[in-house]
């Protein structure tokens, strides 16, 4: 019996690993931290393993460059643009790069992107890029992996790195620092992956491609829902905000963003003196909603059973359990993402019963990435964390309302009422006063049908 076995029998409640210095020196980064060695995996002797690095033709860091949200330059992938093992086609950031940089960092169909820097929870997020129609590049906290397809298909590598085993291998190599965690790509290459017959890898490839196809069809249907909404409001679906602003001036390209108000019309009425609040674009949106043919209402006129979350203590957190804690980072654009959640002790429910989630509830983020909204589509046992507005609604379709809340029509109202410095915050009272156009029931049904079909395909893709 070796020393490790002796210690484990004597102290079964401890994670212990005893190593020779010579064994530690074999590690490419000379790892001596306990988490690396105590999380070591057991391999199946019946399988053929290779190091990931032995199966790659190339690995490459992304480009470090300034980015913008104005659409100037080439779309650039960041850490949050990877979702459910796929690289999203719609990205928020762009970068001005020259031809040589584009040639160096342009993504190719079938490239695998690995997120080397993120929170401990999300580091190692991996997705495959399926686009050969447009130019995309990738940022420096991502790494491009190009597989030798005679040995390892990119779809299989992507799936493996997203499994429990793959994530454990990644996290044991993760190096925590202030507010983020990093994984050295050279250590990633040291991970051993079972090399299955190509026939099996091709089956995985087909499943991933079918998933991607269903997801793209889902996005097209959701886009149809958005187009139907904007057309109903008399806006151009291709650029709804610009079409609204252009309709308010005879010389749209040279219009100045100027708004003049008396003290009575401004501070004494709203309590706000900051110039940003009185930008003409916000007033144009408000006028458009107020003039909608079927009328308008305030959000509070549609709301039932409202709450704004509870500040649960980290002492109540658990890695596994039955009671899920919904945090702001779980709210995506119209989607509740439960892939990375933490749990609460069951008795935490008693701390704030009003913050228990029900199927059909709508959630809106109130801090940071403000105004993100989704519908709770399933029966789940969950509580909402602080700074999340939760409510049920009446006399309006929940999917259509969430579409409105995530559109520029409501996003810019949230932007206008936001307060704070480094992190923007929303008041639940101010949020309930935003304006909502009262879309007629026939149009709501049409929009809701597109959305339901979209989410059915999204569910199929998973």
Please name every model-derived segment.
Residues 1-63, 197-310, 440-462:
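Non-catalytic DNA-recognition/assembly elements of restriction-modification systems
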Residues 49-65, 80-111, 297-314, 329-359:
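Sequence-specific dsDNA recognition surfaces
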Residues 101-102, 178, 351-352, 378, ...:
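A structural connector/turn signal
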Residues 135-143, 175-199, 382-389, 420-443:
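A short glycine-rich beta-alpha junction/loop motif
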Residues 163-166, 407:
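Glycine-rich, acidic and aromatic/proline-enriched surface loops and short helix-turn segments
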């Amino acid at each position: 019996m070796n020393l490790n076995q002796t210690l484990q029998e004597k102290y079964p409640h401890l994670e212990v690993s005893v190593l020779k210095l010579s064994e530690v020196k074999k590690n490419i980064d000379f790892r001596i931290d306990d988490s690396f060695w105590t999380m070591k995996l057991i391999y199946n002797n019946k399988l053929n393993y290779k190091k990931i690095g032995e199966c790659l033709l190339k690995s490459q860091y992304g480009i470090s460059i300034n980015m913008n949200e104005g659409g100037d330059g080439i779309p650039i992938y960041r850490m949050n643009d990877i979702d459910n093992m796929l690289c999203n086609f719609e990205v928020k950031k762009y970068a001005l790069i020259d031809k040589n940089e584009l040639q160096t960092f342009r993504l190719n169909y079938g490239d695998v992107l690995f997120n080397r820097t993120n929170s401990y929870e999300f580091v190692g997020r991996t997705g495959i890029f399926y686009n050969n129609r447009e130019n995309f590049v990738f940022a420096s906290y991502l790494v491009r992996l190009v597989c030798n397809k005679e040995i390892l298909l990119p779809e299989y590598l992507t799936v493996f790195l997203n499994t429990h085993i793959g994530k454990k291998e990644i996290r044991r190599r993760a190096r925590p620092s202030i507010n983020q965690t990093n994984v050295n790509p050279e250590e990633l290459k040291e991970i051993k992956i079972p090399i299955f017959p190509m026939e099996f890898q091709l089956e995985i490839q087909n499943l991933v491609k079918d998933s991607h196809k269903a997801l793209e069809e889902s996005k097209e249907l959701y886009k149809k829902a958005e187009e139907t909404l904007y057309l109903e409001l008399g806006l151009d679906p291709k650029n709804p905000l610009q079409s609204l602003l252009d309709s308010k001036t005879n010389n749209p390209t040279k219009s100045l963003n100027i708004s003049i108000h008396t003290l009575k019309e401004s501070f004494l009425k709203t309590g706000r003196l900051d110039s940003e609040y009185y930008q003409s674009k916000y007033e144009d949106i408000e006028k458009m909603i107020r003039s909608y043919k079927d009328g308008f209402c305030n959000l509070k006129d549609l709301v039932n059973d409202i709450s704004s979350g509870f500040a649960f203590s980290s002492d109540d957190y658990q890695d596994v359990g039955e009671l899920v804690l919904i945090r702001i980072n779980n709210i995506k654009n119209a989607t509740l993402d439960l892939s990375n959640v933490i749990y609460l002790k069951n008795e935490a429910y008693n701390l704030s019963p009003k913050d228990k989630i029900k199927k059909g509830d709508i959630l809106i983020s109130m801090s940071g990435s403000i105004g993100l909204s989704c519908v709770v589509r399933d029966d789940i046992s969950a509580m909402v964390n602080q700074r999340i507005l939760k409510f049920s609604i009446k006399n309006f379709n929940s999917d259509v309302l969430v579409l409105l809340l995530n559109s520029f029509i409501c996003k810019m109202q949230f932007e206008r009422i936001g307060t704070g410095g480094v992190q923007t915050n929303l008041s639940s009272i101010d949020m309930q006063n935003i304006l909502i156009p009262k879309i007629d029931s026939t149009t709501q049904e049409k929009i809701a049908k597109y959305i339901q079909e979209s989410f059915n395909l999204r569910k199929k893709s998973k």
